[in-house]
Amino acid sequence: MPSNLRDKPLIACLHPYVEERRKDIEQGLYPRHHLWGIEDIEKEKNWRTKTISSTSVQVPTLLERLLDRSIFRGSPGTKVELAALRASRISDLVYSVCGPLALAKTYSNKLVSWTFRNPIDLGSSFKLSHRAYRPRNLSANAAFFCLTSKSESSYANFAPSRFIPWCVDMDLFDGLPSAGKPQKPFFLATGKTGRDYCSLVKGSSLVNAEVRIIGPSHQKPDRIPPNVKWIDTSKDPPDQAIDYPTLREWYAQCTAVCIPLSGDSDDTCGYTNMLEAMAMRKPVLMTHSGCLDIDPETRGFGKLIEPQDHSGWTDAMNYILKDKKRADRLGEEGRRMTEKEFTIERFNRDVLKFLRELLENRKELVD
């Protein structure tokens, strides 16, 4: 290898969830924002990159299950952890889209992790499990990327942290009208994590419109009113039930997007769903979140509903149905915001800027 290449720092990228998705992303069948900046990290000329793959890691099945339920509980799992540890031996930084890793203390201060919520309160009952979030382990990270300003303040107690707002694939979610019109108006709700579909379903019974819910069966209420259509996404990946081109069409056809959340004030659940709806020019009806830095009502692209308030869902949906022009204005404001604040290009620039700063600081320490 030429010496000028050997002299360049090496960033190892850990993102096992898209190992088999790169081709789909290139073909526009899967959202590009799920790359988390890796496409531009790979193009950067000031460093080299390596993709961490867990497929070559061999662990006996019983041992893997034991480790996944103990030491690696709350982390991406045994094979991913071991693959990342091996890559850290030859890398200057390990860029983890999987969140904090349980073996961070063995990385020689090279691990840079994305965080999606405030540090988990482990309490006194945890010993081996969730060790990725133990204070000593968090302090061993080189830095943190944070989706919210609230989490930036929390993780800054352990390592340098940078708040970078999320983004959305505006080529897939292009905001254009649907090729066809639905037979009747419908609201759309989708998502598997941190959802409160019981409140939404109960509130839907007094709304003169269909409500389509794309969610796992274990979150499905026992009683479903006639105007609610449930699409099961129990299997992973979720787009086995409905692919993204079809989901994009449903976004385009729906009256508004509903995001009923469980009310966890430290979780960013619903963020991606919200941005996809905004990009598609749809009003966002969403449970109040104590974590996200934007909300639909304050910024003028939707309505907020209090946690577990089924009547609030009824009122919000009827509010949208009552005035189509008002609903269109809310949707247009959401699209305007995504074009200005939540593009992939802006997100990737912010990620690369922080990585450059971290590498420069490491170089100064070595010099």
Q: What label would you give each PLM region?
A:
Residues 319, 326-341, 350-353:
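A short, well-ordered alpha-helix in the C-terminal region of glycosyltransferases
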Residues 298-310, 319-325:
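Conserved acidic donor-binding segment of nucleotide-sugar-dependent glycosyltransferases
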Residues 82-90, 119-144:
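Membrane-proximal helix-turn-helix segments that form the acceptor-binding/catalytic region
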Residues 344-367:
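C-terminal alpha-helical cap of glycosyltransferases
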Residues 140-175, 189:
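Donor nucleotide-sugar binding/catalytic pocket of nucleotide-sugar-dependent glycosyltransferases
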Residues 238-245, 249, 257-275, 286-294:
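Nucleotide-sugar-dependent
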Residues 25-33, 179-247:
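Conserved catalytic-core segment of nucleotide-activated headgroup transferases in glycan assembly
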Residues 255, 281-283:
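A short alpha->beta transition loop at the rim of the catalytic pocket in nucleotide-sugar-dependent
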